[in-house]
Amino acid sequence: GVDKEGCRYLLGACTIDDDCCLHLGCNKKYGHCGWDGTF
């Protein structure tokens, strides 16, 4: 994920990892942001 204005939080809709905020990645199966395992 990225640290930028407008990034999606946990369970926010996404198509790619960079749609999501830091420490979140896009879950392609469900189409939302989830924790990517980083701190």
Curated annotation (Swiss-Prot):
Keyword presence, Repeat: no
Keyword Mitochondrion tagged: no
Keyword list, A-Z: Amidation, Disulfide bond, Ion channel impairing toxin, Knottin, Neurotoxin, Secreted, Toxin, Voltage-gated sodium channel impairing toxin
Domain of life assignment: Eukaryota
Pfam families linked: Toxin_12 (PF07740)
Tissues expressing this chain: Expressed by the venom gland.
Modification sites for Phenylalanine amide: 39
Subcellular location(s) of the protein: Secreted
GO CC field: extracellular region
Main location: secreted
A single GO molecular function term of this UniProt record: ion channel inhibitor activity
InterPro entries: Huwentoxin-1 (IPR011696)
SS bonds (residue pairs): 7-21, 14-26, 20-33
Family: Belongs to the neurotoxin 10 (Hwtx-1) family. 47 subfamily.
Domain statement: The presence of a 'disulfide through disulfide knot' structurally defines this protein as a knottin.
Further details from the record: Negative results: the recombinant toxin has no effect on american cockroach Nav channels and on the human voltage-gated sodium channel Nav1.5/SCN5A.
Function: Insecticidal toxin that acts, at least partially, by inhibiting insect voltage-gated sodium (NaV) channels of several insect species. The toxin binds to the voltage sensor in NaV channel domain II and inhibits channel opening by shifting the threshold for channel activation to more positive voltages. The toxin binding is sensitive to residues in the S1-S2 loop of the domain II voltage sensor. In vivo, the recombinant toxin causes paralysis and/or death to two dipteran species (Lucilia cuprina and Drosophila melanogaster).
Name listed for the protein in its UniProt record: Mu-theraphotoxin-Ae1a
Organism: Augacephalus ezendami
